[in-house]
Amino acid sequence: MKAIFITLEGPDGSGKTTVGTLLNQKMTEAGIDFIKTREPGGSPISEKVRNIVLGIGNEEMDPKTEVLLIAGARRQHVVETIRPALAAGKTVLCDRFMDSSLAYQGAGRDMNMEQVLQVNLYAIEDTLPDRTYYLDVPAEVGLARIAANKGREVNRLDKEDITYHEKVQAGYEKVINMFPERFMRVDATKTPEEITETILADILRQLA
């Protein structure tokens, strides 16, 4: 069985983390040799950067600082975690990757998406995902889910208003148009179990 690099993307409240947990279980049951990781984070240094970027109390962070910190964390994640796993024949399942920077920082912060893309391509070099699953849900539905989920850890980006999250969604649409060959859009208004089964079926096709 070949190894591929898979990413999960979606706006806040899309159920991505829940689906990732279910996928972890289903992929294990299917006998897939893989690791599950996340961004920002995924390596000891990158997790420290995550705490800075997402920490409540860092609201004064400049948008370009945010882009550069996340790109730096991503570089370390690629070098320390993702590439070694792929080289060892393990599939990588990652909760968020470069596309999140394009949507959240590029579009959400009204920055030049091409510049954000170039910074990230410099960081990751040739380590692009083979397959990206975009969990598609309206911004207002996602934010309502966040508000209803009292056990969810709320980070600095969750506290942004609906306008910001709508910009993020528009940004994702631009990213999908940039890389249509690797994206699969998944209806995230369905149950986490239904979403997981849809994604798992496609993963098995990709690995065949």
From Swiss-Prot:
Reactions mediated catalytically: dTMP + ATP = dTDP + ADP
Family note: Belongs to the thymidylate kinase family.
Binding locations of ATP: G10, P11, D12, G13, S14, G15, K16, T17
Database matches in Pfam families: Thymidylate_kin
Gene3D superfamilies on file: P-loop containing nucleotide triphosphate hydrolases
GO molecular function term, any single one: ATP binding
Record-linked PANTHER family: THYMIDYLATE KINASE (PTHR10344), UMP-CMP KINASE 2, MITOCHONDRIAL (PTHR10344:SF4)
GO CC field: cytosol
CDD domains noted in UniProt: TMPK (cd01672)
Leading EC class: transferase
Described function: Phosphorylation of dTMP to form dTDP in both de novo and salvage pathways of dTTP synthesis.
Enzyme Commission code(s) on record: 2.7.4.9
InterPro entries, A to Z: P-loop_NTPase (IPR027417), Thymidylate_kin-like_dom (IPR039430), Thymidylate_kin_CS (IPR018095), Thymidylate_kinase (IPR018094)
Highest classification ranks of the organism: Bacteria, Bacillati, Bacillota, Bacilli, Bacillales
Name by which UniProt lists this protein: Thymidylate kinase
